[in-house]
């Protein structure tokens, strides 16, 4: 089937392609067979990503690290609630589900519409078709006393700093307690969108980055940094 997406939403096909390519490799890092299944059903020119090896290893290492961190949280809180911000066609729930967690996928209506074409309904998974910058989505999250983890992968770098600040305020204004895991882009990379091995072929571009991971908590004094992982280590 043909898929048409605008600007930032189209970048979800980059990570989908990298995970699917990994699944076909002899020594897969994620072995994400669902991504391989999805990509086989999409009519899109994925060939423009074929030589993007820097993005390939970057996407996989980032996904693996985040999988591991999410698993640690689940081990500590087996019946927790997890919200995936800007989920795209992410398949993390299928990779880390323990049979008890409650999962929410948050993305724009056009993206959630596409998700429903590829994923079977699950009573513990809820799709929310709203913008992360619209605080109304927080009312859809049912915690019922459970611990909350908010994750976002490959999303924040496409927005302006003021938007990131707005998003963080939505989190701290609407949730009394939560843990968050975000991936951040190095500031020096922001101006290199047109040279980036995948973005050079797309409309989307990087808009925000940091010199140090601690910079994100400076945007909201209610946040406290509890850890930092360098994906290049």
Predicted regions and their residues:
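Rossmann-like AdoMet
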Residues: 1-83, 87-130, 143-144
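A short, conserved alpha-helix within the catalytic core of class I
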Residues: 127, 136-138, 158-176
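Short "lid" loop at the C-terminus of a central beta-strand within the Rossmann-like core
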Residues: 133, 157, 184-189
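Short amphipathic alpha-helix with an adjacent loop that forms part of the alpha/beta core around
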Residues: 135-145
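A short beta-strand submotif of the Rossmann-like class I SAM-dependent methyltransferase core
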Residues: 148-153, 164
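Conserved beta-strand signature within the Rossmann-like core of class I S-adenosyl-L-methionine
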Residues: 148-149, 171-187
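Short, glycine-/aromatic-enriched active-site segment of Class I SAM-dependent methyltransferases
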Residues: 187-204
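Short alpha-helix
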Residues: 203-230
């Amino acid at each position: 089937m043909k898929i048409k997406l605008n600007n930032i939403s189209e970048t979800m096909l980059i990570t989908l392609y990298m995970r699917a390519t990994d699944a076909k490799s002899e020594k897969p890092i994620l072995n994400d067979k669902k991504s391989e299944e999805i990509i086989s059903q999409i009519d899109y020119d994925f060939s423009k990503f074929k030589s993007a090896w820097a993005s390939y290893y970057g996407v996989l290492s980032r996904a693996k690290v985040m999988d591991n961190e999410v698993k640690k949280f689940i081990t500590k809180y087996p019946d927790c609630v997890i919200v995936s911000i800007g989920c795209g066609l992410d398949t993390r729930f299928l990779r880390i589900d323990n049979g008890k967690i409650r999962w929410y996928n948050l993305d724009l209506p056009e993206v959630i519409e596409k998700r429903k074409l590829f994923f079977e309904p699950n009573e513990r998974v809820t799709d929310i078709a709203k913008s992360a910058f619209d605080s109304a989505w927080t009312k859809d999250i049912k915690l019922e006393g459970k611990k909350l983890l908010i994750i976002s992968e490959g999303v924040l770098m496409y927005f302006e700093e003021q938007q990131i600040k707005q998003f963080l305020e939505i989190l701290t204004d609407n949730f009394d307690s939560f843990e968050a895991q975000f991936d951040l882009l190095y500031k020096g990379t922001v101006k290199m969108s047109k040279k980036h091995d995948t973005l050079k072929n797309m409309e989307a571009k990087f808009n925000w980055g940091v010199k140090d991971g601690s910079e994100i908590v400076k945007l909201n004094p209610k946040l406290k940094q509890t850890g930092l992982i360098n994906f290049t280590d």
